[in-house]
C-alpha cells in the first residue's frame, strides 16, 4: 500500500485506465468477430457495416492510447481483406 498521496492517486488512475482499456479491447474483439462471422456467412452488407464500425472503433482506440497505431492498421487491413474476399465471392456467385 502506498503512503505517498500522489502515488495513491496514481494507483487509482491506473486502475481506472486499466478497466477502461479492458472494456475497449473487449469491444474491439467483439466487433472484429462480427466482421469475421459476416464474411464467413457471405453476408456482404452486414460485413461492410461491421467493418465500418470496427474501423471507427479501432481509430478511436488509437487516439485514446489503448492500442498502438500499427496494431490498429494490421487489424483493419486483415478484416478489410476478409470483406474484399466476400465481395469477390458474391460477385462471382452471381455470374
Curated annotation (Swiss-Prot):
Keywords: Ribonucleoprotein, Ribosomal protein, RNA-binding, rRNA-binding. It comes from the Bacteria. InterPro entries: Ribosomal_bS20, Ribosomal_bS20_sf. Residues 12-22 have a biased composition (Basic and acidic residues). The keyword Ribosomal protein applies. GO terms for biological process: translation. The keyword rRNA-binding applies. It holds the Pfam family Ribosomal_S20p. GO terms for cellular component: cytosol; small ribosomal subunit. SUPFAM superfamilies: Ribosomal protein S20. Residues 1-22 are annotated as: Disordered. GO terms for molecular function: small ribosomal subunit rRNA binding; structural constituent of ribosome. Belongs to the bacterial ribosomal protein bS20 family. Binds directly to 16S ribosomal RNA. This is Small ribosomal subunit protein bS20. It comes from Tropheryma whipplei (strain Twist). The lineage of its organism: Bacteria, Bacillati, Actinomycetota, Actinomycetes, Micrococcales.
Amino acid at each position: 500500500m502506498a503512503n505517498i498521496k500522489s502515488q495513491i492517486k496514481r494507483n487509482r488512475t491506473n486502475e481506472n485506465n486499466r478497466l477502461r482499456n479492458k472494456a475497449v479491447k473487449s469491444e474491439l474483439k467483439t466487433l472484429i468477430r462480427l466482421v469475421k462471422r459476416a464474411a464467413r456467412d457471405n453476408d456482404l452488407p452486414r460485413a461492410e457495416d461491421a467493418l465500418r464500425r470496427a474501423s471507427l472503433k479501432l481509430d478511436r482506440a488509437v487516439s485514446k492510447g489503448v492500442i498502438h497505431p500499427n496494431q490498429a492498421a494490421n487489424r483493419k487491413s486483415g478484416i478489410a481483406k476478409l470483406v474484399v474476399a466476400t465481395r469477390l465471392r458474391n460477385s462471382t456467385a452471381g455470374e
